[in-house]
Protein backbone atom coordinates (compact mmCIF):
# COMPACT_ATOMS: atom_id res chain seq x y z
CA UNK A 1 0.00 0.00 0.00
CA UNK A 2 2.65 2.59 -0.96
CA UNK A 3 0.23 5.25 -2.12
CA UNK A 4 -1.37 8.48 -1.05
CA UNK A 5 -3.08 6.44 1.68
CA UNK A 6 0.26 5.21 3.01
CA UNK A 7 1.59 8.75 2.98
CA UNK A 8 -1.39 10.01 4.99
CA UNK A 9 -1.03 7.19 7.51
CA UNK A 10 2.66 7.90 8.00
CA UNK A 11 1.93 11.62 8.32
CA UNK A 12 -0.63 10.90 11.05
CA UNK A 13 2.01 8.96 12.98
CA UNK A 14 4.55 11.75 12.42
CA UNK A 15 2.12 14.23 14.02
CA UNK A 16 2.21 12.02 17.10
CA UNK A 17 6.00 12.05 16.97
CA UNK A 18 5.92 15.85 16.84
CA UNK A 19 3.70 16.01 19.92
CA UNK A 20 5.90 13.56 21.83
CA UNK A 21 9.10 15.37 20.86
CA UNK A 22 7.67 18.70 21.97
CA UNK A 23 6.56 17.54 25.42
CA UNK A 24 9.79 15.60 26.00
CA UNK A 25 12.02 18.67 25.65
CA UNK A 26 9.85 21.69 26.48
CA UNK A 27 9.98 21.12 30.24
CA UNK A 28 13.76 21.59 30.16
CA UNK A 29 13.37 25.10 28.77
CA UNK A 30 10.71 26.05 31.31
CA UNK A 31 12.23 24.64 34.52
CA UNK A 32 12.33 28.03 36.32
CA UNK A 33 8.68 28.72 35.50
CA UNK A 34 7.52 25.19 36.34
CA UNK A 35 9.52 25.28 39.58
CA UNK A 36 7.90 28.56 40.63
CA UNK A 37 4.45 27.36 39.60
CA UNK A 38 4.66 24.17 41.65
CA UNK A 39 6.46 25.65 44.65
CA UNK A 40 9.78 23.82 44.36
CA UNK A 41 13.35 24.82 43.56
CA UNK A 42 14.88 24.33 40.11
CA UNK A 43 16.90 21.18 40.96
CA UNK A 44 13.74 19.56 42.32
CA UNK A 45 11.82 20.64 39.21
CA UNK A 46 14.35 18.62 37.23
CA UNK A 47 12.61 15.56 38.66
CA UNK A 48 9.72 16.28 36.28
CA UNK A 49 12.08 15.60 33.36
CA UNK A 50 13.28 12.41 35.04
CA UNK A 51 9.68 11.31 35.68
CA UNK A 52 8.90 11.53 31.96
CA UNK A 53 12.04 9.56 31.06
CA UNK A 54 11.17 6.92 33.67
CA UNK A 55 7.73 6.62 32.12
CA UNK A 56 9.33 5.95 28.73
CA UNK A 57 11.66 3.26 30.08
CA UNK A 58 8.95 1.50 32.10
CA UNK A 59 6.04 1.93 29.73
CA UNK A 60 7.64 0.79 26.48
CA UNK A 61 8.19 -2.92 27.27
CA UNK A 62 5.09 -3.33 29.45
CA UNK A 63 2.69 -1.86 26.91
CA UNK A 64 4.33 -3.67 23.98
CA UNK A 65 3.93 -7.06 25.67
CA UNK A 66 0.43 -6.53 27.08
CA UNK A 67 -0.88 -5.17 23.77
CA UNK A 68 0.74 -7.87 21.62
CA UNK A 69 -2.55 -9.43 20.46
CA UNK A 70 -4.54 -6.22 20.15
CA UNK A 71 -5.06 -4.52 16.77
CA UNK A 72 -2.20 -2.08 16.36
CA UNK A 73 -4.44 0.73 15.17
CA UNK A 74 -6.50 0.44 18.34
CA UNK A 75 -3.39 0.40 20.51
CA UNK A 76 -1.86 3.44 18.79
CA UNK A 77 -5.08 5.43 19.16
CA UNK A 78 -5.38 4.44 22.84
CA UNK A 79 -1.75 5.40 23.49
CA UNK A 80 -2.21 8.84 21.96
CA UNK A 81 -5.46 9.42 23.86
CA UNK A 82 -3.67 8.60 27.14
CA UNK A 83 -0.75 10.83 26.11
CA UNK A 84 -3.03 13.77 25.28
CA UNK A 85 -5.05 13.46 28.49
CA UNK A 86 -1.92 13.21 30.66
CA UNK A 87 -0.43 16.31 29.05
CA UNK A 88 -3.61 18.34 29.50
CA UNK A 89 -3.71 17.16 33.12
CA UNK A 90 -0.10 18.32 33.55
CA UNK A 91 -1.27 21.87 32.95
CA UNK A 92 -4.00 21.68 35.60
CA UNK A 93 -1.88 20.67 38.59
CA UNK A 94 0.20 23.05 40.66
CA UNK A 95 1.95 20.84 43.20
CA UNK A 96 4.93 18.50 43.03
CA UNK A 97 3.47 15.00 43.48
CA UNK A 98 0.53 15.28 41.04
CA UNK A 99 2.78 16.73 38.33
CA UNK A 100 5.30 13.93 38.86
CA UNK A 101 2.51 11.41 38.30
CA UNK A 102 1.20 13.27 35.24
CA UNK A 103 4.66 13.47 33.66
CA UNK A 104 5.32 9.77 34.33
CA UNK A 105 2.04 8.81 32.67
CA UNK A 106 2.79 11.19 29.78
CA UNK A 107 6.04 9.31 29.15
CA UNK A 108 4.60 5.79 29.25
CA UNK A 109 3.11 5.80 25.71
CA UNK A 110 6.31 7.25 24.17
CA UNK A 111 8.34 4.12 23.38
CA UNK A 112 5.36 1.90 22.56
CA UNK A 113 3.95 4.53 20.18
CA UNK A 114 7.19 4.83 18.23
CA UNK A 115 7.78 1.08 18.34
CA UNK A 116 4.33 0.08 17.07
CA UNK A 117 4.19 3.10 14.77
CA UNK A 118 7.43 1.99 13.15
CA UNK A 119 6.03 -1.49 12.52
CA UNK A 120 2.86 -0.05 11.02
CA UNK A 121 4.76 2.39 8.79
CA UNK A 122 7.11 -0.37 7.61
CA UNK A 123 4.13 -2.58 6.72
CA UNK A 124 2.72 0.08 4.39
CA UNK A 125 5.72 0.27 2.05
CA UNK A 126 7.91 -2.16 0.08
CA UNK A 127 10.75 -3.80 2.07
CA UNK A 128 13.45 -1.54 0.62
CA UNK A 129 11.52 1.52 1.86
CA UNK A 130 11.11 0.41 5.49
CA UNK A 131 13.90 2.56 6.91
CA UNK A 132 12.53 5.59 5.05
CA UNK A 133 9.06 4.97 6.52
CA UNK A 134 10.47 4.64 10.04
CA UNK A 135 12.49 7.83 9.55
CA UNK A 136 9.41 9.75 8.46
CA UNK A 137 7.73 8.97 11.80
CA UNK A 138 10.82 9.87 13.79
CA UNK A 139 11.19 13.10 11.81
CA UNK A 140 8.38 14.41 14.00
CA UNK A 141 10.90 14.44 16.85
CA UNK A 142 13.32 16.45 14.74
CA UNK A 143 10.74 18.99 13.63
CA UNK A 144 9.68 19.36 17.26
CA UNK A 145 13.21 20.53 18.08
CA UNK A 146 13.12 23.09 15.27
CA UNK A 147 9.58 24.43 15.69
CA UNK A 148 7.60 22.86 18.52
CA UNK A 149 10.01 23.29 21.43
CA UNK A 150 11.09 26.91 20.70
CA UNK A 151 7.51 28.03 20.05
CA UNK A 152 5.96 26.37 23.09
CA UNK A 153 8.86 27.52 25.27
CA UNK A 154 8.24 31.10 24.16
CA UNK A 155 4.51 30.78 24.87
CA UNK A 156 5.25 29.21 28.23
CA UNK A 157 7.52 32.09 29.18
CA UNK A 158 5.10 34.77 27.97
CA UNK A 159 1.72 33.33 28.99
CA UNK A 160 2.27 30.53 31.50
CA UNK A 161 4.10 27.23 31.86
CA UNK A 162 0.82 25.30 31.60
CA UNK A 163 0.14 26.46 28.03
CA UNK A 164 2.69 24.17 26.29
CA UNK A 165 1.15 21.10 27.91
CA UNK A 166 -2.31 22.10 26.71
CA UNK A 167 -0.98 22.73 23.20
CA UNK A 168 0.68 19.30 23.17
CA UNK A 169 -2.61 17.78 24.33
CA UNK A 170 -4.40 19.46 21.42
CA UNK A 171 -1.80 18.18 18.94
CA UNK A 172 -2.22 14.71 20.44
CA UNK A 173 -5.97 14.97 19.91
CA UNK A 174 -5.39 15.97 16.27
CA UNK A 175 -3.14 12.91 15.89
CA UNK A 176 -5.92 10.70 17.27
CA UNK A 177 -8.37 12.05 14.69
CA UNK A 178 -5.83 11.59 11.88
CA UNK A 179 -5.01 8.01 12.90
CA UNK A 180 -8.68 7.05 13.17
CA UNK A 181 -9.26 8.45 9.67
CA UNK A 182 -6.10 7.33 7.90
CA UNK A 183 -4.58 4.24 9.53
CA UNK A 184 -5.82 1.13 7.69
CA UNK A 185 -7.18 -1.67 9.86
CA UNK A 186 -5.82 -4.51 7.76
CA UNK A 187 -2.21 -3.33 7.96
CA UNK A 188 -2.09 -2.90 11.70
CA UNK A 189 -3.27 -6.10 13.33
CA UNK A 190 -0.98 -7.60 15.94
CA UNK A 191 -0.48 -11.32 15.32
CA UNK A 192 2.14 -11.93 18.02
CA UNK A 193 1.31 -13.46 21.36
CA UNK A 194 2.59 -12.54 24.80
CA UNK A 195 5.18 -15.33 24.53
CA UNK A 196 6.17 -14.34 21.00
CA UNK A 197 7.05 -10.85 22.19
CA UNK A 198 9.07 -12.11 25.15
CA UNK A 199 10.88 -14.59 22.89
CA UNK A 200 12.65 -11.63 21.30
CA UNK A 201 14.60 -11.26 24.55
CA UNK A 202 16.18 -14.69 23.99
CA UNK A 203 17.89 -13.53 20.78
CA UNK A 204 21.50 -12.41 21.07
CA UNK A 205 21.21 -10.06 18.10
CA UNK A 206 18.35 -8.18 19.77
CA UNK A 207 20.49 -7.53 22.84
CA UNK A 208 23.43 -6.48 20.69
CA UNK A 209 21.26 -4.00 18.79
CA UNK A 210 19.95 -2.58 22.07
CA UNK A 211 23.51 -2.34 23.39
CA UNK A 212 24.55 -0.42 20.27
CA UNK A 213 21.80 2.09 20.98
CA UNK A 214 22.60 2.41 24.67
CA UNK A 215 26.35 2.88 24.26
CA UNK A 216 26.47 4.56 20.85
CA UNK A 217 23.84 7.15 21.69
CA UNK A 218 25.32 7.64 25.12
CA UNK A 219 28.18 9.31 23.26
CA UNK A 220 25.88 11.80 21.58
CA UNK A 221 24.01 12.60 24.79
CA UNK A 222 27.22 13.13 26.76
CA UNK A 223 27.86 16.03 24.37
CA UNK A 224 24.34 17.36 23.87
CA UNK A 225 23.56 17.44 27.60
CA UNK A 226 26.20 20.17 28.02
CA UNK A 227 25.79 21.92 24.69
CA UNK A 228 24.75 25.28 26.17
CA UNK A 229 27.79 25.80 28.44
CA UNK A 230 30.04 24.36 25.73
CA UNK A 231 28.81 26.97 23.27
CA UNK A 232 28.98 29.87 25.74
CA UNK A 233 32.23 28.94 27.51
CA UNK A 234 34.30 27.55 24.63
CA UNK A 235 32.85 29.12 21.50
CA UNK A 236 31.95 32.43 23.14
CA UNK A 237 28.43 32.40 21.69
CA UNK A 238 26.09 34.72 23.64
CA UNK A 239 23.43 33.00 25.72
CA UNK A 240 20.69 34.74 23.75
CA UNK A 241 21.80 32.91 20.59
CA UNK A 242 21.56 29.44 22.12
CA UNK A 243 17.96 28.89 20.87
CA UNK A 244 19.26 29.48 17.35
CA UNK A 245 22.06 26.97 17.92
CA UNK A 246 19.54 24.42 19.18
CA UNK A 247 17.33 25.05 16.15
CA UNK A 248 20.36 24.35 13.94
CA UNK A 249 20.78 21.08 15.83
CA UNK A 250 17.13 20.32 15.05
CA UNK A 251 17.71 21.03 11.36
CA UNK A 252 20.56 18.55 11.50
CA UNK A 253 18.17 15.97 12.93
CA UNK A 254 15.76 16.56 10.05
CA UNK A 255 18.60 16.15 7.55
CA UNK A 256 19.70 12.92 9.22
CA UNK A 257 16.22 11.42 9.20
CA UNK A 258 15.74 12.26 5.53
CA UNK A 259 19.16 10.81 4.69
CA UNK A 260 18.64 7.56 6.63
CA UNK A 261 16.48 5.97 3.93
CA UNK A 262 19.20 6.44 1.33
CA UNK A 263 21.89 5.11 3.65
CA UNK A 264 19.78 1.99 4.23
CA UNK A 265 20.13 1.08 0.55
CA UNK A 266 23.82 0.39 1.26
CA UNK A 267 22.81 -2.23 3.83
CA UNK A 268 21.47 -1.81 7.36
CA UNK A 269 24.57 -3.05 9.21
CA UNK A 270 26.92 -1.20 6.88
CA UNK A 271 24.94 1.95 7.58
CA UNK A 272 25.05 1.38 11.35
CA UNK A 273 28.79 0.73 11.35
CA UNK A 274 29.51 3.68 9.08
CA UNK A 275 27.32 6.02 11.15
CA UNK A 276 29.00 5.01 14.41
CA UNK A 277 32.46 5.45 12.91
CA UNK A 278 31.52 8.93 11.69
CA UNK A 279 30.02 9.80 15.09
CA UNK A 280 33.20 8.69 16.86
CA UNK A 281 35.40 10.86 14.63
CA UNK A 282 33.07 13.85 14.91
CA UNK A 283 32.93 13.67 18.71
CA UNK A 284 36.70 13.25 18.96
CA UNK A 285 37.16 16.51 17.04
CA UNK A 286 34.19 18.35 18.59
CA UNK A 287 36.08 19.65 21.62
CA UNK A 288 38.72 21.27 19.41
CA UNK A 289 36.21 22.72 16.94
CA UNK A 290 34.12 24.20 19.77
CA UNK A 291 36.72 26.92 20.34
CA UNK A 292 35.67 28.54 17.05
CA UNK A 293 32.11 29.95 16.90
CA UNK A 294 31.71 29.06 13.22
CA UNK A 295 33.11 25.54 13.57
CA UNK A 296 31.13 25.02 16.78
CA UNK A 297 27.84 25.72 15.01
CA UNK A 298 28.82 23.50 12.07
CA UNK A 299 29.63 20.65 14.44
CA UNK A 300 26.35 21.13 16.32
CA UNK A 301 24.57 20.66 12.98
CA UNK A 302 26.61 17.49 12.32
CA UNK A 303 25.82 16.34 15.86
CA UNK A 304 22.18 16.46 14.81
CA UNK A 305 22.73 14.71 11.47
CA UNK A 306 24.78 11.61 12.25
CA UNK A 307 22.88 10.12 15.22
CA UNK A 308 19.60 10.81 13.42
CA UNK A 309 20.77 8.59 10.57
CA UNK A 310 21.51 5.86 13.09
CA UNK A 311 18.12 5.81 14.88
CA UNK A 312 15.97 4.54 11.94
CA UNK A 313 18.70 2.08 10.96
CA UNK A 314 18.72 0.60 14.46
CA UNK A 315 14.92 0.47 14.50
CA UNK A 316 14.96 -1.46 11.21
CA UNK A 317 17.71 -3.75 12.49
CA UNK A 318 15.60 -4.65 15.52
CA UNK A 319 12.66 -5.49 13.24
CA UNK A 320 14.92 -7.83 11.28
CA UNK A 321 16.42 -9.71 14.23
CA UNK A 322 13.42 -9.83 16.61
CA UNK A 323 11.34 -12.08 14.33
CA UNK A 324 8.02 -12.70 16.16
CA UNK A 325 8.75 -10.17 18.92
CA UNK A 326 9.05 -7.06 16.78
CA UNK A 327 6.68 -4.96 18.88
CA UNK A 328 8.65 -5.39 22.10
CA UNK A 329 12.04 -4.98 20.42
CA UNK A 330 11.01 -1.84 18.57
CA UNK A 331 9.59 -0.31 21.75
CA UNK A 332 12.68 -1.23 23.76
CA UNK A 333 14.78 0.76 21.29
CA UNK A 334 13.31 3.94 22.76
CA UNK A 335 13.85 2.72 26.30
CA UNK A 336 17.52 2.25 25.48
CA UNK A 337 17.73 5.75 23.98
CA UNK A 338 16.49 7.20 27.26
CA UNK A 339 18.97 5.01 29.12
CA UNK A 340 21.66 6.36 26.80
CA UNK A 341 20.54 9.87 27.69
CA UNK A 342 21.07 9.21 31.40
CA UNK A 343 24.34 7.33 30.83
CA UNK A 344 25.88 9.99 28.60
CA UNK A 345 24.87 12.90 30.82
CA UNK A 346 26.20 11.11 33.90
CA UNK A 347 29.58 10.28 32.36
CA UNK A 348 29.86 13.83 31.08
CA UNK A 349 29.19 15.14 34.57
CA UNK A 350 32.02 13.02 35.96
CA UNK A 351 34.70 14.60 33.75
CA UNK A 352 33.30 18.07 34.39
CA UNK A 353 33.29 17.46 38.15
CA UNK A 354 36.92 16.39 37.82
CA UNK A 355 37.66 19.83 36.37
CA UNK A 356 38.65 18.66 32.89
CA UNK A 357 36.63 21.31 31.06
CA UNK A 358 33.84 21.36 28.47
CA UNK A 359 36.08 19.84 25.79
CA UNK A 360 35.85 16.50 27.57
CA UNK A 361 32.21 15.38 27.49
CA UNK A 362 32.47 14.99 23.70
CA UNK A 363 35.73 13.05 24.08
CA UNK A 364 34.03 10.69 26.50
CA UNK A 365 31.27 10.49 23.91
CA UNK A 366 33.80 9.49 21.25
CA UNK A 367 34.95 6.62 23.47
CA UNK A 368 31.37 5.46 23.89
CA UNK A 369 30.81 5.66 20.13
CA UNK A 370 33.91 3.52 19.55
CA UNK A 371 32.56 0.97 22.03
CA UNK A 372 29.22 1.01 20.20
CA UNK A 373 31.11 0.55 16.93
CA UNK A 374 32.85 -2.50 18.37
CA UNK A 375 29.50 -4.01 19.37
CA UNK A 376 28.14 -3.33 15.87
CA UNK A 377 31.12 -5.04 14.24
CA UNK A 378 30.64 -8.02 16.58
CA UNK A 379 26.95 -8.16 15.68
CA UNK A 380 27.74 -8.13 11.96
CA UNK A 381 30.37 -10.85 12.37
CA UNK A 382 28.01 -13.09 14.34
CA UNK A 383 25.34 -12.50 11.71
CA UNK A 384 27.67 -13.67 8.95
CA UNK A 385 28.68 -16.76 10.95
CA UNK A 386 25.03 -17.65 11.51
CA UNK A 387 24.11 -17.11 7.87
CA UNK A 388 27.01 -19.20 6.52
CA UNK A 389 25.89 -22.60 7.93
CA UNK A 390 22.35 -21.92 6.70
CA UNK A 391 23.56 -21.23 3.18
CA UNK A 392 25.74 -24.34 3.24
CA UNK A 393 22.81 -26.41 4.48
CA UNK A 394 20.67 -25.06 1.67
Write out the residue ranges for each language-model feature:
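Paired small-residue
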Residues: 11, 82, 86-89, 97-106, ...
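Helix-breaking motifs and short loop linkers at transmembrane-helix boundaries and internal kinks
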Residues: 39, 71, 92-98, 236, ...
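A late C-terminal transmembrane helix in Major Facilitator Superfamily
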Residues: 321-358, 365
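Cytoplasmic helix-loop-helix junction between adjacent transmembrane helices
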Residues: 102-140
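Helix-to-loop junctions at the C-terminal end of transmembrane segments
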Residues: 60-72, 256-268, 352-353
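C-terminal transmembrane helical hairpin of 12-TM major facilitator-type secondary transporters
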Residues: 270-314
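C-terminal membrane-cytosol helix-exit motif in multi-pass small-molecule transporters
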Residues: 169-189, 375-379
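Conserved MFS/SLC helix-loop-helix module at the cytosolic interface between two early adjacent transmembrane helices
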Residues: 58-97
Amino acid sequence: MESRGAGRAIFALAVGGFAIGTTEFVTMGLLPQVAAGTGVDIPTAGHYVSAYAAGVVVGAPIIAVLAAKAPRKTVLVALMVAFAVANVASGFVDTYAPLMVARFISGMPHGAFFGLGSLVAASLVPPHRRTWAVAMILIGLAVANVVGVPLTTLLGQRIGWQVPFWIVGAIGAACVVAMVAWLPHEAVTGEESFRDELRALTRVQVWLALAIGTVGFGGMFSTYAYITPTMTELAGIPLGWIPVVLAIYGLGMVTGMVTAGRVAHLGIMRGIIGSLAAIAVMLAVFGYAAHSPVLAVIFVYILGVLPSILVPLLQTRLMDVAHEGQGLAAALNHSTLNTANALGAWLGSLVLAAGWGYEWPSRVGAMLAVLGLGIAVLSAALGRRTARPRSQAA
